Amino acid sequence: DLPRLQYTEMVIKEAMRLYPPAWGTTREAIADVELGDYTLRKGGVAFLNFWGVHRDARFFPNPERFDPERFNPENEKQIPKYAFLPFGAGPRVCIGNAFAMMEAKLIVATVAQHFRFELAPGHPVQPERVFTLRPKYGMRMIARRREHS
């Protein structure tokens, strides 16, 4: 049933757009490279800010708004190739990305069948940038069992 979990995948992608697991990375230039008006010399290090790219209004209108429809099949085609990087890209892309997405879809769909989650009132949501991006104060949630008929 994984192919039928399209909306679940859209929700997960939008969550990773707003809160990418890896919020940035560095790359060392193996040759001189021109980046706009700037020259990065061989051996120089560039920081790639996934967090910033994911919240850039040029790529994602109303970037602070949670909108899974950004990732419906038609809309997703409009996202530039390197504007969505929750697992990195290119030769160093995370080799576990397909497995991680499959696992996330199964977990989210299974749990969401039985529970609704709401953020606890007044609980601050503040990302903390360490090696990975995580909630500084955790995520206090209220779980409510779904009524099944």
Label the model's feature ranges.
Residues 138-149:
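C-terminal helix/juxtamembrane-tail motif
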Residues 2, 48-76:
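Conserved cytochrome P450 K-helix/beta-meander segment immediately N-terminal to the heme-binding cysteine loop
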